[in-house]
Amino acid sequence: MPQPTSSDVHVDAILSNMSVAYMQEAYAFVAGRAFPTVNVQKQTDKYFTYSQADFFRDQVQRRADGTESAGTGYSLSTATYNAEVYALHKDIGDQTRANADIPLNMDMDATRILSQQMLIRQEVQWAADSFTTGVWGTDATPSPLWDAASSTPIADIETAKNTVLTNTGYVPNTVIMSYKVFSALVDNSDIVDRIKYTSQESVTEELLARLFGVDRVLIMAATYNTAAEGATASYSLVGDKDVLVCYTPANPGLMVPSAGYNMVWTGVSAGLGTGAAVSRYRIEERKADRIEIEAAFDFKIVSSALGYFLSNCTS
């Protein structure tokens, strides 16, 4: 069966921009916000990592007159990333388009469902890569759990911050939690008692950030259907009952430490410079137009010591 050639496939800037805007407005998803994004020109490549141990030694010495100063240095190693390509399409048949009240809306609707599913794929992938045990410098479980009357979530977060600070020299500035954990904290006495005499605010991400002493709290509120197409829908939240306390900079840099980076390959966007692109092309033998979304990314943990993972925070 004939296939479209590369010259037939057109990355649609309008649909791509609409897809990017939709992704940016989907606040239930944290994958695109958890780590700084690094746009990369190559799908897979190496990057340098600096020795943390060398940077944190106390090697400055007194200098006697006429003598050399003490010397130091640092070692470099390399790590790799691989921005896997993910894609999905939706075909719009000519008969379906002809029967539509507003034909243009069919392209927009296709872009929306493709964008939604790309968001889900990114969120599920980020959770599998980064929101789990065994990948960060420290794993712990609060005791008591945070839905218990005697629990101390503020102290538990402070313990996490102190651990990361001791091991890296950086105070964590980000707390990422599942919606199940957030729901438990809304009625947690350790939280509520701190604000009941001083504020009429309800418990929000911003209020938790102030109580925890971090720049931001991100709530994982994305849900998805785990059942196969045609089966009875079965919905599940992406995040379970866990919390990640980590340090991430506002902007990536060559010598800027971060718990992780989102490596985004721009090669799929045909010059738009984004990590996701929407193409539209003709499938003549099917008498249909194909709308296709494609993205390439790798959620890369760069420094495991800059993360502290709290699992099973509620019962």
Where do the PLM segments sit?
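Hydrophobic, aromatic-lined core segments that form the binding pocket/scaffold
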Residues: 67-71
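Glycine-centered small-residue hotspots that permit tight backbone geometry or close packing
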Residues: 64-66, 178, 213
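Sequence/fold signature of self-assembling virion shell proteins
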Residues: 2-62, 77-84, 145-151, 192-315
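Short acidic, glycine/tyrosine-flanked loop/strand segments centered on an H-E-D-like triad
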Residues: 76-100
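Generic "edge-of-domain/loop-turn" microfeature
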Residues: 88, 97, 182, 224, ...
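Charged, low-complexity, helix/coiled-coil-prone segments
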Residues: 42-64, 92-111
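Alpha-helical scaffold segments that mediate packing/assembly in large oligomeric complexes
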Residues: 94-174, 179-196, 314-315
